[in-house]
């Protein structure tokens, strides 16, 4: 096997941070001059998370090739430089669909199709396909869910088989939670012992145990885990809850020397990772910054931060690059009093979304920003909000709307894209993935990007109606970015406003801590200027 494989499983509880751990490991290995690929295996039966409720699953992250994926792939992107595509994700739904399709085609020649060997073989095939596509030195495979869940069993069995065949090239990390009982004044290792016992019962013996805890674990506790989980002392690692930011995780793992331990066990003798640039940014996060802005994020899933995970992170990236602290204020567009809080903000961001709930509240937010000169950034649905508000209140088009919200609107300034109306299925049928966009010179977005040709990722069915584009321009709402292939409106800017920009794509999917997205940087710069001007009034 020409590549090494790291398997990451989780036990005791869900939401341990396996995705962040996998992303951090990818960064550390890349900084050792290794080429890394990543694969997320999710046990749920949905084909993808594209139609799942954000309250249940969080945001949907979209790759360049138009695949709707788990938000963990967003972590992979923000921490590392791995190439993410359809080969980087697989769900039980996809695996079963592939097997059933082959059965219908007669591939199995009349055999009884079973979880073992057919489903497990398909999972192994997915792993090999990812490696073949990316040709990595190391492939990191994260298995969603928790050891002990019924849904995870086929994936764990597939890993067991894979490890049997390629033992020298595989490394298994089991991540667990070590709780601290305040009443007893001590940490408890028993849940970790039982979790490892369950994993061993399946036939997987972990090569390392990564213990998450609220406080650092003593050497005595680590030795106890080592003894009862049958791994060497040196194979027990500890990560504590981060103090300031998730971006501290790679530094924490680096101090634990886990990547060095892994590479030595796999026979990959590389240089020590260089994280000097990362450390500089983390120091900024830890220390008071000279400037601060407050950004109002107006949406309908604001009670669940994971629903807008990439947006939150992109704002942080941009602010940090400008040596600026940021206070992100989630505002529910259905709250009758949210405008009072928005008035105190230095900028407003309306992210993507679907459906009529909270729609009118978002329009009132755009109106407030336009009239008060508050910087406004509309993403996907947020751009459509900007256009509808402008049509109603500047162009005097009474009851202008999107046909998504009102099929009978007299002024459909936002309408469904050609070809979408005939589609019956909802999953995977939108305009998805990266498309080119040509920017108009002399505009705010051109200034932000510093170039005229860009590529951005999309996830939408609706667009600005061609029939209203000239009217919009005549009234001061300029179309400053278009798709050269179809002429679709991708970016709008309002004249005579400090920064009122709407984009049909999702720039948050491209932002990283090291390289923040230029539009988010431009937005935070405008918010900083607004804040300074406001303080002098």
From Swiss-Prot:
ATP binds at residues 15-20, 72. It catalyses: UTP + L-glutamine + ATP + H2O = CTP + L-glutamate + ADP + phosphate + 2 H(+); L-glutamine + H2O = L-glutamate + NH4(+); UTP + NH4(+) + ATP = CTP + ADP + phosphate + 2 H(+). Allosterically activated by GTP, when glutamine is the substrate; GTP has no effect on the reaction when ammonia is the substrate. The allosteric effector GTP functions by stabilizing the protein conformation that binds the tetrahedral intermediate(s) formed during glutamine hydrolysis. Inhibited by the product CTP, via allosteric rather than competitive inhibition. UTP binds at residues 14, 188-193, 224. Keywords: ATP-binding, Glutamine amidotransferase, Ligase, Magnesium, Metal-binding, Nucleotide-binding, Pyrimidine biosynthesis. Pfam families: CTP_synth_N, GATase. One of its GO terms (molecular function) is glutaminase activity. InterPro entries: Class_I_gatase-like, CTP_synthase, CTP_synthase_N, GATASE, GATase1_CTP_Synthase, P-loop_NTPase. L-glutamine binds at residues 55, 353, 381-384, 404, 461. The active site is at 380 (nucleophile), 506, 508. Residues 1-268 are annotated as: Amidoligase domain. Homotetramer. CTPSs have evolved a hybrid strategy for distinguishing between UTP and CTP. The overlapping regions of the product feedback inhibitory and substrate sites recognize a common feature in both compounds, the triphosphate moiety. To differentiate isosteric substrate and product pyrimidine rings, an additional pocket far from the expected kinase/ligase catalytic site, specifically recognizes the cytosine and ribose portions of the product inhibitor. Catalyzes the ATP-dependent amination of UTP to CTP with either L-glutamine or ammonia as the source of nitrogen. Regulates intracellular CTP levels through interactions with the four ribonucleotide triphosphates. This is CTP synthase. It comes from Chlamydia caviae (strain ATCC VR-813 / DSM 19441 / 03DC25 / GPIC) (Chlamydophila caviae).
